[in-house]
């Protein structure tokens, strides 16, 4: 059997990290099994589905390195196939038209809640006579189409993550709506559980890998597979992603879309690595930092956890820093320059930009940190509190004056480490202060604060633009 899995996102929003993690698990399983990873765009929600969301989803998958093997299936283009399946169920007496109005359904649910019962459809239109249907049509009522669910039925399957699973028909909320409300002589728009079954069968999907919030849907869909006499796939229900407090991750938690992570400066490699670890345990002796290709070699569902996976920002940040610290200067600069340009910063000297990237690289956790840390090299920074305090130290300003005087007396052709150390030593001696006091004061003058990258390299980079003397003058 050829393994065929699919990701089936709805283009009603941008690519969510939960969908992306599902994509990662599907892709890893397909690649490990030498199978196929497919896409189906479930765009049947006409009001909310937008082409720009489809493009966002596809772009996000490409960015993460999740390639697919066949042209994406567009679900809305198959609506007549879905309607044919519904007509088949109607003809076999396995589905029926239900004329209960929305107001009547609301009243039914309210009465059930008032009596302490879970809300469910009570199947009241399951056995309508022809005359009763005609009477409802005469009233102008439209009908949904419902699939009959036997309350006594037992639905069982073996889940690749959770093992043996079993549901009772009585726990599925009554007969299931499989087509929206429409005039009684037509079939309305087919709904999720029906179209998923029809499309997965048509795509010859062998394994359905999705979140645990779909478990109840799986029970319903298994009944539809049986009724339509379709081959049933194997199911795997992965754990939900939880926020650090243990609740389901949602938009209220802030960053949830892949685009948000990109904007913040996370790398595709680190994010894909981390999403793999959200619910999957690496085999013993395997490093937690890996590429998707490396993970695919050892991925299996017997190491996917049942419990929800808490999102750990510290772990993601550590992975991202490890990736950035392994980048070449050229790779780092390619990521930083577009962000610098977005700030309006013009780099006229490629060698200078390369040296700045080399200087900043070891301290970066996020690519966006390379904007924050680069700002003093493009813009004159304000003097922060710790910098101001340093400049008030005894001997600080006289030492900076001595350093500035030495710079202005000499037409330096460049500032190397040896020359910088000599200048610092001589200026400190001239002002009768310790060299360390001068170095702290110089950092405050150049960067506006006492924290930052290597001082001599910082000074040399600013000197190449003539900014060092200007910043010394403002502090005197």
Swiss-Prot record:
Its EC number is 6.1.1.17. The keyword Transmembrane does not apply. Pfam families: Anticodon_2 (PF19269), tRNA-synt_1c (PF00749). GO terms for molecular function: ATP binding; glutamate-tRNA ligase activity; tRNA binding; zinc ion binding. PROSITE patterns: AA_TRNA_LIGASE_I (PS00178). It is an enzyme of class 6 (ligase). One of its GO terms (cellular component) is cytosol. ATP binds at residue 251. One of its GO terms (biological process) is glutamyl-tRNA aminoacylation. The keyword ATP-binding applies. It comes from the Bacteria. A motif ('HIGH' region) lies at residues 9-19. It is found in: Cytoplasm. A motif ('KMSKS' region) lies at residues 248-252. Keywords: Aminoacyl-tRNA synthetase, ATP-binding, Cytoplasm, Ligase, Nucleotide-binding, Protein biosynthesis. Its main location: cytoplasm. It catalyses: tRNA(Glu) + L-glutamate + ATP = L-glutamyl-tRNA(Glu) + AMP + diphosphate. HAMAP family: Glu_tRNA_synth_type1. Belongs to the class-I aminoacyl-tRNA synthetase family. Glutamate--tRNA ligase type 1 subfamily. Catalyzes the attachment of glutamate to tRNA(Glu) in a two-step reaction: glutamate is first activated by ATP to form Glu-AMP and then transferred to the acceptor end of tRNA(Glu). Monomer. PANTHER family: GLUTAMATE--TRNA LIGASE, GLUTAMATE--TRNA LIGASE, MITOCHONDRIAL-RELATED. This is Glutamate--tRNA ligase. It comes from Synechococcus sp. (strain CC9311).
